[in-house]
Amino acid sequence: MAEHLASIFGTEKDRVNCPFYFKIGACRHGDRCSRLHNKPSVSPTLLLSNMYLRPDMITPGIDAQGNPIDPEKIQADFEDFYEDIFEELSKYGEIESLHVCDNFADHMIGNVYVQFREEDQAARALQALTGRYYSGRPIIVEFSPVSDFREATCRQYEENSCNRGGYCNFMHVKEIGRDLRKRLFGHLHRSRRSHSHGRSRSPSPYHYRRDYDRRSSSRSRDHDDYYRGGSHDYYRGGSRRSSERHRSSYDSDGSRRRHRSRTRSPVRDGSEERRAQIEQWNREREAAQV
């Protein structure tokens, strides 16, 4: 019996534990779910809920004023965000992977998953980010049970064949460009190869492009000093792309320090029609499995 329960744990056959929360760390039912959400007390993976606000979050491809948005601008906005959050999170440890959801369902939209190499690194990040703000919005961060993103991501989406679109309950991971990925993660991979060949290990990859201004006596800062909160008073941007194009802030008091001159994306309200559509899709899925 114990072996049977262990074999079905976190699967659709498990009637006690929620399989979606186990695989994805998020469930469309939230606290109303009839199955248990076993939240880990420690994990190398963190979930930052609804953190990314895309410019077309209300209607895909359309801004808040009803005007079409160039897909290249949407991607540029996303890569600014991705680089910004990578650089902030990398202060606390070595990042194995960083994923941002492209889903539209309320429990998935804008979710950021970061997996550190060690659990204690994730714990440091959790402690540092709790109670802080990003672009005037509180950061909602918690340990996530996700350990294998292959089980959490939608394979049909990767093949451009998901018929549920943005309301799929599995992760639709928004991709960054090859150049940015190489710049952010390339040094990490080179450092590991060097270590595996017995050479002295390179300096920790999450310090590879930054100087940290730890001075706290003066409130007058260069315009590139745009982070506030946590253990460091300010974070000095060293990347040309980040310092010149992206001005997002991590604030400890909720005050806004906007990035660039963009109008902030409006907060997305829940839609009864959209929820009904999601419910219908899930009923169809459950019926197909019977």
Curated annotation (Swiss-Prot):
GO biological process, one term: mRNA splicing, via spliceosome
UniProt biased composition (Basic and acidic residues): 208-255, 266-290
Pfam family, one: RRM_1
Compartment list: Nucleus
A Gene Ontology term for the protein's cellular component: U2AF complex
Keywords: DNA-binding, Metal-binding, mRNA processing, mRNA splicing, Nucleus, Repeat, RNA-binding, Zinc, Zinc-finger
Protein name: Splicing factor U2af small subunit A
